[in-house]
A protein has these predicted regions:
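Short glycine/proline-centered loop/turn elements that form peptide/ligand docking sites
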Residues: 80
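Short acidic-hydrophobic sequence patches enriched in Asp/Glu that either
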Residues: 62, 83
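N-terminal pre-ligand scaffold of iron-sulfur
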Residues: 1-58, 71-72, 76, 85-103
Length: 103
């Protein structure tokens, strides 16, 4: 069963910003881009480099290590060298607090 966990306040993340945190031993990255929030596992599926070091444009995050790109909504790998998707987590904002659901 999924559990909802508070990660941070929405105001902690500037537009086009990122917020990395450990939630129940899971490395979670919250991304705010174009007014939307996304929650992903903070780990590139190519060589496990932290995606929090990468760049964001629209709904795409690019790994700083080797240039792999992922769709923030679906986790789908968009280009080599990554072929495996990243984990995405459901999130919701309640009274300004961002919560993620982990399995």
């Amino acid at each position: 069963m999924s559990e909802r966990h508070a990660v941070c306040n929405e105001s902690d993340i500037p537009e086009n910003g990122k917020y990395a945190a450990f939630v129940e031993d899971e490395e979670v990255l919250i991304v705010k881009s174009e007014g939307r929030l996304y929650a992903i596992r903070d780990c590139c599926s190519h060589q496990e480099f932290p995606l929090s070091h990468g760049s964001v444009k629209g709904k795409v995050i690019k790994c700083k290590a080797h240039g792999a790109e992922f769709d923030l909504e679906t986790g789908r790998a968009l280009c080599a060298p990554a072929h495996v998707p990243i984990d995405v987590f459901p999130l919701e904002v309640i009274d300004g607090v961002i919560y993620v659901e982990l399995d």
